[in-house]
């Protein structure tokens, strides 16, 4: 069953530990909550002093933040968005999720107040801002990265890609997206 599949995937992907939560999180809110609960438990168990935790946005990462228990003792950690913001739902923004997790862990958090989709010229100007530069320096030193993998079609729409690009991705067999990269 699932344990055998977990072991196979661990071997194929070269991953030390992999957990499969049965069900379809798109159809069942309880599956998403369980994913959040398991992920937050793993994070808490692996934390060490001075960790820099990067987290992306999305419904799964919001579930991780929601299901994380408030720590009884503060952790000397920094939580930071691993990417800029995307879309308009506050609850699923990486900034919001980083703040919730940072507070629940009794640690610190930083915000990254830039959109996820910026033209190169605009990005070059924005990264000169000291606050943003400090956040980017922290991102470069993340030692725990927590990210979701989204459906390619849904993420292409959220990223407001041109219809031609979306069609091209779908024709190429794209099924998943992470960090703006699409996978078949």
Functional labels for PLM-detected ranges:
Residues 53-63, 86-87, 152-153:
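Gly/Ser/Thr-rich loops at beta-strand to alpha-helix junctions
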Residues 7-49, 73-156, 160-162, 166-173:
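Ligand-binding beta-strand-loop-alpha-helix segment within the catalytic cores
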Residues 1-4:
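N-terminal helix-turn-helix DNA-binding module of bacterial transcription factors
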Residues 66-70:
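Distinct, well-ordered alpha-helical segments
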Residues 169-184:
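Glycine-rich phosphate/nucleotide-binding loop
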């Amino acid at each position: 069953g699932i344990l055998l599949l977990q072991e196979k995937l661990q071997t194929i992907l070269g991953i030390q530990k992999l957990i499969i939560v049965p069900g379809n999180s798109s159809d069942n809110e309880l599956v998403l909550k369980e994913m959040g609960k398991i992920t937050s438990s793993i994070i808490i168990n692996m934390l060490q002093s001075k960790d820099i935790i990067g987290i992306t946005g999305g419904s799964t990462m919001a579930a991780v933040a929601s299901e994380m228990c408030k720590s009884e003792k503060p952790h000397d950690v920094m939580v930071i968005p691993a990417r800029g913001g995307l879309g308009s739902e506050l609850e699923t923004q990486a900034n919001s999720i980083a703040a919730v997790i940072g507070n629940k862990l009794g640690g610190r958090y930083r915000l990254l107040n830039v959109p996820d989709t910026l033209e190169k010229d605009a990005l070059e100007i924005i990264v000169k801002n000291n606050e943003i530069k400090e956040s980017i320096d922290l991102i470069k030193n993340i030692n725990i990265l927590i990210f979701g993998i989204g459906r390619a079609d849904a993420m292409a729409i959220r990223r407001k890609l041109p219809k031609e690009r979306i069609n091209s991705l779908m024709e190429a067999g794209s099924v998943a997206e992470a960090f703006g990269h699409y996978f078949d």
